[in-house]
């Protein structure tokens, strides 16, 4: 049975049980501050478990793209070393939201595995929760009794809280779970050791394939449990492990989920991969196998993340994606001898293999290919640079142990992998101070953790069961009541309060648009005095699990009274102009550059707009002028907003509306039209494009391979921009004595500047030549070394030129020169290569020592190094100390 057939059978089975089949949510989460990525099948349904929304159906099933790089068995650095853990994986899942419970979930799981997939019953073990005195949760007798009717009692295992009580996080819905494990060992192996003893013990052929979670409780901030108002079922089955079991393999990587990718890697690199059936392989072959597993696993995670809108970067989720990709690159570099980008060539295989079920990987194939290629090329350059830096560290090392702090600097600053550092050091006969490296790493983690720690209290619910209504499309002010509040304490923001209202005109951050700001004003009817009314500033608005959260630094004195919610209309007006202009610009870009242009990210705030889009070359100045002119023409056309607030998504798409990849849409959507511009969008817009007034592009540049970014302004910001330009032009005219032709005057100045620069360069050359001829007579011969140390009156750059010239005049030369530029001392050392090789002298070491006297630092190569400092008075002593290196 192929993996495609296995996936289809799962969905078909649960469709026959009355489940609505829904598509996978994007792997990148955009509206859940507690998660960067979809790490489980249930992540997209959290709002239903929390009671903040109503699902399309009480029964749902899907296959969800998931990504994990931390947690139980999911440390990134371990992936590839075993045969059944992954960064990106598919989670087959079926859910019940207050509908069926344990009986149906367990019976259907058993029916599918044993009757449809025909896994032998004697190969299966199940576990149930043994109970917890700590949480006052009893043994799961109900699940035990159901399983007893399906499987021999000696195949039912009692599991502890770690393995058989599933929790969403530190807080939130949770409950006991019942796992199903499969034993894939040979009959001989089973006869020797019981599979029961290997369950949950990291045996590669006795693995969990399905977990049925019975959501009954809510974990509160104080750690206690309370009953949920309804019981839910949340199940997850690892697709790759299921394929391993059904295809008769003992490794996920030997299934047809991975073999096409593995075959492509072996074809590109020439290195062979051996299946898990081959035993007693060499250590070298094992390293090759691990490297190939790492690469084929990681390319899936990276490709799907990019396709869903997450580009590699240096922060947040983007950093995680970059880290995964770089791990794959370094395994290829180290163990498969790949010095050119090659992982990018796997994208076509992945798109062909999975594009039918996940069309985004097919439609975004070119973008994914280009981004990975650029990331590979960049990191391969970093690896080459890191090798040079590591050579420098080794040269400075006294003894045979390299500083862990230095290795961490290579890792942290330059991205040079620590395992590669350790490997190279061993080859050179050195050891790595691992304790020092780990200490530096832990210190950084502690700093990061302390900076990002957030303590969230439980909700205090004032009005139970209320579903918040957003009225912000029609109103900027409305009467409201507070329905719930909670306190959040973080290192970054201090104490904040999250307030939920029964209805709100405040737009929550989403779709690239920032959240509204404004005020809550108490509606105190008992007093006509405005001073008696309390005003609370709302500093931000966000959405979490279908709740609109209003952030404030304080709570009202009386939270049970009525309030008037007032949006800051000035900020909203500016934001709406920028948002509508973004739509007009998107249309213009597609018209001028081509329909390949797709939105890849945006930021819309009151000050400016930022728009990231797919395009594979720089946008020319002429094209930018065309885009600007097109947008301004649409503004001048005074296009009226046409809003379809609750239109079926199919109808909207049929009308030509653009949907954005990586966005999660419901059955009904909001569609925004300005003339030919039609987009699915939930944001705030102007009523007529004339309100935008004017559109001005400020900059255009690259964000990543195949991704460009435009920043632009509208409305009052354009007026301020032109006023500033006018003032600057007036100042320039004043400086130039108010010439009639300002352009001609500036051009004349530029020509004069070029001539003067040439004259200065000639004078400097003559000065350097004169100093060279003077100083050549001041060399001293000491122990067969031609030594010179001197302070000169030159710029730092010219001092280096003179140093090189003097060094080449005599054999065995050792020259130290110093100078002062802008009241800052600089010092430089040249050592002839024959002295570096023959006497072990090192200019880098010299500069580090002499730099102490000028309160500075520096470095370079063994034959040439430079440094800068702060203490001018230390130059004399530094030059005097230089001679000690040759005595």
UniProtKB/Swiss-Prot annotation:
InterPro entries linked to this entry: aa-tRNA-synth_II/BPL/LPL, Ala-tRNA-lgiase_IIc, Ala-tRNA-ligase_IIc_anticod-bd, Ala-tRNA-synth_IIc_core, Ala-tRNA-synth_IIc_N, Ala-tRNA_ligase, Ala_tRNA_ligase_euk/bac, DHHA1_dom
Spans traversing the lipid bilayer: none
PROSITE patterns named in the record: AA_TRNA_LIGASE_II_ALA
Subcellular location field: Cytoplasm
Signal peptide positions (record): none
Top-rank taxon: Bacteria
MF (Gene Ontology): alanine-tRNA ligase activity; aminoacyl-tRNA deacylase activity; ATP binding; tRNA binding; zinc ion binding
Alphabetized UniProt keyword annotations: Aminoacyl-tRNA synthetase, ATP-binding, Cytoplasm, Ligase, Metal-binding, Nucleotide-binding, Protein biosynthesis, RNA-binding, tRNA-binding, Zinc
Gene Ontology cellular component annotations, sorted alphabetically: cytoplasm
Record protein name field: Alanine--tRNA ligase
């Amino acid at each position: 049975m192929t993996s495609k057939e296995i996936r289809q059978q799962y969905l078909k089975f649960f469709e026959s049980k009355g489940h609505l089949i829904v598509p996978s949510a994007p792997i990148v989460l955009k509206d859940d501050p507690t998660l960067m990525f979809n790490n489980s099948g249930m992540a997209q349904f959290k709002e239903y478990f929390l009671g903040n929304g109503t699902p399309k159906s009480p029964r749902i099933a899907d296959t969800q793209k998931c990504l994990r790089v931390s947690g139980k068995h999911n440390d990134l650095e371990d992936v590839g070393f075993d045969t059944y853990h992954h960064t990106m994986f598919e989670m087959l899942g079926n859910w019940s939201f207050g509908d069926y419970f344990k009986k149906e979930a367990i019976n259907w799981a058993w029916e599918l595995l044993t009757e449809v997939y025909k896994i032998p019953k004697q190969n299966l073990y199940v576990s149930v929760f043994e109970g917890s005195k700590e949480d006052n949760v009893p043994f799961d007798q109900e699940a035990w009794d159901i399983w007893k009717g399906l499987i021999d009692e000696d195949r039912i295992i009692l599991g502890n809280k770690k393995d058989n009580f599933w929790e969403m996080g530190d807080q939130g819905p949770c409950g006991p779970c019942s796992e199903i494990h499969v034993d894939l060992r040979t009959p001989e192996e089973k006869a020797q050791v019981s599979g029961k003893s290997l369950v949950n013990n990291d045996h590669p052929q006795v693995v969990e394939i399905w977990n049925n979670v019975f959501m009954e409780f809510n974990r509160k901030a104080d750690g206690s449990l309370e009953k949920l108002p309804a019981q839910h079922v949340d199940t997850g089955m690892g697709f790759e492990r299921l394929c391993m079991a059904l295809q008769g393999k003992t490794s996920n990587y030997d299934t047809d989920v991975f073999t096409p990718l593995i075959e492509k890697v072996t074809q590109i690199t020439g290195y062979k991969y051996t299946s898990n059936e081959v035993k007693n392989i060499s250590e070298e072959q094992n390293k090759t196998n691990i490297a190939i597993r790492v690469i084929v696993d990681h390319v899936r995670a990276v490709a799907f993340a990019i396709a869903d809108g997450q580009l590699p970067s240096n922060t947040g989720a983007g950093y995680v994606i970059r880290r995964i990709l770089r791990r794959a690159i370094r395994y290829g570099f180290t163990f498969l001898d790949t010095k050119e980008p090659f992982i990018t060539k796997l994208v076509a295989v992945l798109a062909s293999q999975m594009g039918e079920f996940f069309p985004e990987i097919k439609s975004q194939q070119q973008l994914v290919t280009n981004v990975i290629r650029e990331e590979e090329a960049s990191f391969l350059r970093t690896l080459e640079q890191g090798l040079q830096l590591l050579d420098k560290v080794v040269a400075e090392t006294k003894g045979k142990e390299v500083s862990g702090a230095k290795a961490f600097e290579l890792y942290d600053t330059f991205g040079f992998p620590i395992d590669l550092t350790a490997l190279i050091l061993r080859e050179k006969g050195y050891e790595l101070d691992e304790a020092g490296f780990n200490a530096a790493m832990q210190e950084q983690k502690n700093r990061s953790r302390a900076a990002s720690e957030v303590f969230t209290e439980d909700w205090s619910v004032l009005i139970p069961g209320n579903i918040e209504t957003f009225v912000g499309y029609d109103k900027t002010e409305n009467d409201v009541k507070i329905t719930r509040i909670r306190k959040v304490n973080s290192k970054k923001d201090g104490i904040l309060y999250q307030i939920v209202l029964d209805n709100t005109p405040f737009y929550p951050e989403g779709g690239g648009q920032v959240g509204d700001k404004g005020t809550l004003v108490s509606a105190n009817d008992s007093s006509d005095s405005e001073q008696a009314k309390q005003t609370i500033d709302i500093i931000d608005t966000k959405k979490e699990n279908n709740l609109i959260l209003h952030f404030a630094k304080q709570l009202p004195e009386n939270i049970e009274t009525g309030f008037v919610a007032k949006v800051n209309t000035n900020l909203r007006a500016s934001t709406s102009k920028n948002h509508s202009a973004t739509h007009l610009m998107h249309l213009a870009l597609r018209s001028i550059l081509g329909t390949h242009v797709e939105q890849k990210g945006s930021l819309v705030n009151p000050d400016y707009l930022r728009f990231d889009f797919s395009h594979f070359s720089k946008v020319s100045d002429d094209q930018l002028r065309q885009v600007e002119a097109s947008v301004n023409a649409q503004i001048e056309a005074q296009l009226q907003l046409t809003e379809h607030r609750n239109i079926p998504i199919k109808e909207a798409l049929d009308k030509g509306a653009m949907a954005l990849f990586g966005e999660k849409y419901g059955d009904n959507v909001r569609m925004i039209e300005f003339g030919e511009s039609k987009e699915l969008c939930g944001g705030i817009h102007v009523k007529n494009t004339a309100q935008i007034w004017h559109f001005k592009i400020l900059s255009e540049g690259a964000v990543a391979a195949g991704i460009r970014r435009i920043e632009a302004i509208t409305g009052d910001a354009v007026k301020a921009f032109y006023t500033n330009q006018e003032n600057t032009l007036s100042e320039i005219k004043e400086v130039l004595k108010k010439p009639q032709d300002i352009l001609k005057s500036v051009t004349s100045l530029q020509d004069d500047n070029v001539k003067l620069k040439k004259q200065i360069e000639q004078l400097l050359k003559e000065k350097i030549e004169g100093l060279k001829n003077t100083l050549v007579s001041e060399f001293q011969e000491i122990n067969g070394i031609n030594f010179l140390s001197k302070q000169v009156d030159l710029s730092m750059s010219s001092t280096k030129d003179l140093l090189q010239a003097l060094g080449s005049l005599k054999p065995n030369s050792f020259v130290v020169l110093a100078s002062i530029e802008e009241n800052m001392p600089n010092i430089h050392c040249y050592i002839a290569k024959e002295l570096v090789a023959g006497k072990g002298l090192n200019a880098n070491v010299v500069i580090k020592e002499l730099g102490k006297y000028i309160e500075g630092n520096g470095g370079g190569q063994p034959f040439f190094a430079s440094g800068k400092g702060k203490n001018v008075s230390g130059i004399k002593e530094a030059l005097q100390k230089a001679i000690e290196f040759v005595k």
